[in-house]
Amino acid sequence: IEMNCRGSNIIERVFRDVNPTPYISLFIDGCMEKGRDVMAGGAVLYEGLGTIFAGLATYADSMAAVRRLVYEDKKYTLPELITALDADFDGYDDIRRDCLQAAKYGNDCDEADFIARDIIDYTEQKMNSYPSLYARHIHGTLSQSFNTPLGAMIGATPDGRKAGKPLSDGMSPSQGMDKKGPTAIIKSVSKLNVESMSLGMAHNFKLLPRFLETAEGQHAVISLLKTASLLGNGQMQFNCVDNETLRAAQQHPGQYRDLIVRV
């Protein structure tokens, strides 16, 4: 985190000196009054540069598995688990099965959900402790699509994820790990402190198209949104497309020009 903040300060200096934004500055309170570009600290409220993080659920699920299997149940030693990870679980099917069966964020399970909450709070507090040129450093949990290339560079993880596979995206559960339905997902997300994600957050929610083909399904989605709002969830965005459509779009992109997928 410290290295990231130092790098951001260098970027701020470069932006200030070689990349002013006079047009944007016209619409930012304080810039006209001070006669300073927003990149040079002209804004009345200036948060500074932010950092977006990927792999929240991957981290939470991994730490939950380590705590349960190594420290609480003492089923494996830490060196044994590391050996299995280094081997990408090849020859360690039993260890991987136990890792996959450990608590997972997104199932309204405090064991994993509170780890996700704690790492978000810690990250924001730690970043706030490093000054930027004009304010403070902040972070957000909205991985956009870089959770996939990052995952390609990272080995196996204690949540049971194999080497090279995508990390989890945004505030969403790890792929395929939400087992208890949409209500459990939003209850897990509601435990996160949205005020600790000053740069923003993204919760990608996947729905099958047939779910919205009936009035009952449509009302269920409306109820889900209302419940999420009441629980204090900061953000939700929906993908409503099936795998067959996505594969067809890859093969024949010209036929699917109106297809929009949130990432």
Q: Can you annotate each of these PLM segments?
A:
Residues 1-263:
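Acidic, glycine-enriched catalytic cores built around paired aspartates
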